[in-house]
C-alpha cells in the first residue's frame, strides 16, 4: 500500500510526514534536546577547564600506541572529560591544575580514529595556543 494520492489527502500526508520525521536520527537529535543536555559543552564550540591528570589511552586494534590525553574538569558545569593532546611532545607543555581550552574533535560528538571514547582536543594551555608552543613561536607564561 503506497501513500495517499487523491484530493483532500493533504491532512493525512502532512500528519504522516510529521510522525515519520521522528524516525530520522538527525532530526530527533536536533529537536528532542536530550543530545544538548548530554553534551558536556552544553551547545558551545569550546570550553575552559582545569587539568586533573595526564592519561595514556591505548589505541584500538590494529594500531599499537599510547595516545597522550588529559582528564579535564570543565569550569562551567564541573563535568569531567578526556581530551586528546595533539602533536609530538605537546604533553610536556601541560601540567596538572593548568587551565586549558578544549574544543570538539571532529565527528560531531563521536570518537575519532583509533582513540576510543575521546571526543575532545586541547587547543590552548594557560591562554597560549598549543600550536604556537609546539612551533616555538611562544613560550609558556611563568607563574
From Swiss-Prot:
Cysteine disulfide links: none
Keyword check for Iron-sulfur: no
Residues bearing PTM N6-acetyllysine: 135
UniProt modified residues of type N6-succinyllysine: 54
GO cellular component: cytoplasm; cytosol; cytosolic ribosome; cytosolic small ribosomal subunit; endoplasmic reticulum; membrane; nucleolus; nucleoplasm
Chain segments carrying region Disordered: 1-26
Subcellular location: Cytoplasm, Cytosol; Cytoplasm; Rough endoplasmic reticulum; Nucleus, Nucleolus
Alphabetical UniProt keywords: Acetylation, Cytoplasm, Deafness, Disease variant, Dwarfism, Endoplasmic reticulum, Hydroxylation, Isopeptide bond, Nucleus, Ribonucleoprotein, Ribosomal protein, Ubl conjugation
Effect caused by changing residue 120 to I: In BTDD; decreases hydroxylation of the protein; decreases the accuracy of translation; decreases levels of incorporation of the mutant protein into polysomes; patient cells become highly sensitive to oxidative stress
GO molecular function terms attached to this record: RNA binding; structural constituent of ribosome
Post-translational modification (record): Hydroxylation at Pro-62 affects translation termination efficiency.
Biological process annotations from GO: cytoplasmic translation; maintenance of translational fidelity; ribosomal small subunit biogenesis; stress granule assembly; translation
Residues joined by cross-link Glycyl lysine isopeptide (Lys-Gly) (interchain with G-Cter in SUMO2): 37
Domain of life: Eukaryota
Primary location class: cytoplasm
Modified residues (3-hydroxyproline): 62
UniProt feature, compositional bias: Basic residues: 1-20
Any matching Pfam family: Ribosom_S12_S23
Family: Belongs to the universal ribosomal protein uS12 family.
PANTHER family documented for this protein: 30S RIBOSOMAL PROTEIN S12 FAMILY MEMBER
Subunit structure, as described in the record: Component of the 40S small ribosomal subunit. Part of the small subunit (SSU) processome, composed of more than 70 proteins and the RNA chaperone small nucleolar RNA (snoRNA) U3.
Associated disorder: Brachycephaly, trichomegaly, and developmental delay: An autosomal dominant developmental disorder characterized by brachycephaly, ciliary trichomegaly, dysmorphic features of the face and hands, hearing loss, and developmental delay with short stature. Intellectual disability and autism spectrum disorder may be present in some patients.
Designated name of the protein: Small ribosomal subunit protein uS12
Organism: Homo sapiens
Name of the encoding gene: RPS23
